């Protein structure tokens, strides 16, 4: 038991040290004092836009500092309880303390990753698109496995999800889907997952038991706040309505409630069929279009648009971000960071935190996603 406790303590202390350096707590505290003085100025609201910017920054820094101090305080309290339990040889309390250290280790590691979030939309909700590659049944099944993986990942992080659009495969799985992920910092946690995913396994659909390779792609873009202006001209839009093709009961296919919107200049397409109301589906599809166009604009600014669009559209060997090998051995490897694990079951069950952390650490050198 003592060895496990020591291991958790070491992990927590290492995370807190990395957080201290990542946030630069001393500089953060100085900046927070400056912001408190600026936001106390009675003339602050003479410039509404500037006031909103300063308040957002102040609230963000206050939250980070409060979380850091609370983690330190929690560690101190548990260490004090552990010392008393050790003196009294209270095994029951020590068992509970071990679980407390485990929980604190998980929370601290999560906050350590969130300290790497630096984009202006990292705190927002986001949309996740999954598209099966060529290969019919195999890729459709792989796309559905990916959908489950990301739904479980969102659940692990405490996010809510809503399937906006889904097209089923002819035999199994899905051809494509769009999922709205709802929760604070959802985009920050998902943004590095855009790209092509390759699966190697013994096919359950091949009578000869051959090893097969399948591809599917994911693309993540942030939901846009009202204070971010995205101009879309009506003349640039083509709006089509159609009957829903997904599951949902007898009412789904009785009216043309599903909506597809095409932004003609960029050939960007969104569609929604999650509601029986055409009006609500149109509003959701328009919100998704705004988010996609914002993402494309950010990519252009970062001079990554060609690479990102390739990742989004070309489900092939040359644009992979991750490989999932289930036979003849088991390994999941990220081809950008070289991070890998043999826990394929855990990964496919949504355990993606370490992959995200590795990608964010690499991107933190200055690349934005």
Swiss-Prot record:
Example GO molecular function: translation release factor activity, codon specific
Alphabetical keyword list: Cytoplasm, Methylation, Protein biosynthesis
Modification N5-methylglutamine, positions: 250
PTM description: Methylated by PrmC. Methylation increases the termination efficiency of RF2.
Subcellular localization, as worded in the UniProt entry: Cytoplasm
Record-linked HAMAP family: Rel_fac_2
Source organism superkingdom: Bacteria
First-listed, main subcellular location of the protein, grouped into a coarse class: cytoplasm
Signal sequence range: none
Cellular component per GO, a single term: cytoplasm
Designated name of the protein: Peptide chain release factor 2
PANTHER family linked: CLASS I PEPTIDE CHAIN RELEASE FACTOR, PEPTIDE CHAIN RELEASE FACTOR 2
Pfam family, one: RF-1
InterPro entries: PCRF (IPR005139), Pep_chain_release_fac_I (IPR000352), Pep_chain_release_fac_I_sf (IPR045853), PrfB (IPR004374)
Organism classification: Bacteria, Pseudomonadati, Pseudomonadota, Alphaproteobacteria, Rickettsiales
Family of this protein: Belongs to the prokaryotic/mitochondrial release factor family.
UniProt-listed Gene3D superfamilies: 3.30.160.20, 3.30.70.1660, Release factor (1.20.58.410)
SUPFAM superfamilies per the UniProt record, alphabetical: Release factor
């Amino acid at each position: 038991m003592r060895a496990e406790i020591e291991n958790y303590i070491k992990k927590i202390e290492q995370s807190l040290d990395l957080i201290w350096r990542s946030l630069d707590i001393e500089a953060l505290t100085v900046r927070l004092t400056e912001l408190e003085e600026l936001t106390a100025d009675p003339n602050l609201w003479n410039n509404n836009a500037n006031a909103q910017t300063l308040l957002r920054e102040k609230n963000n820094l206050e939250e980070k500092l409060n979380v850091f101090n609370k983690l330190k305080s929690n560690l101190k309290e548990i260490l004090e309880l552990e010392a008393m339990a050790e003196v009294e040889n209270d095994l029951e309390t020590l068992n509970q303390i071990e679980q407390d250290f485990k929980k604190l280790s998980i929370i601290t590691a999560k906050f350590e990753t969130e300290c790497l979030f630096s984009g202006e939309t990292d705190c927002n909700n986001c949309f996740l698109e999954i598209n099966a590659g060529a290969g019919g049944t195999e890729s459709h099944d792989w796309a559905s496995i990916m959908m489950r993986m990301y739904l479980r990942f969102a659940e692990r992080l405490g996010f809510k999800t809503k399937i906006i659009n889904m097209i089923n495969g002819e035999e199994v799985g899905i051809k494509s889907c769009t999922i709205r992920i709802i929760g604070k910092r959802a985009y920050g946690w998902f943004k590095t997952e855009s790209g092509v995913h390759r699966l190697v396994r013994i096919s359950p659909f091949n009578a000869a038991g051959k090893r097969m390779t399948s591809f599917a792609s994911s693309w993540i873009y942030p939901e846009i706040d009202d204070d971010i202006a995205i101009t879309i001209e009506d003349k640039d839009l083509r709006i089509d309505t159609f009957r829903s093709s997904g599951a949902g009961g007898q009412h789904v296919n009785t009216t043309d409630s599903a909506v597809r919107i095409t932004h003609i200049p960029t050939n960007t397409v969104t569609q929604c069929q999650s509601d029986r109301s055409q009006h609500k589906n149109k509003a959701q599809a328009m919100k998704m279009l705004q988010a996609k166009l914002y993402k494309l604009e950010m990519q252009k600014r970062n001079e990554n648009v060609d690479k990102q669009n390739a990742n989004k559209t070309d489900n092939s060997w040359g644009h992979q971000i991750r490989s999932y090998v289930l036979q003849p051995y088991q390994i999941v490897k990220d081809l950008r960071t070289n991070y890998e694990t043999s826990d394929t079951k855990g990964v496919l069950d949504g355990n993606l935190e370490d992959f995200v952390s590795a990608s964010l650490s690499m991107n933190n050198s200055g690349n934005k996603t």
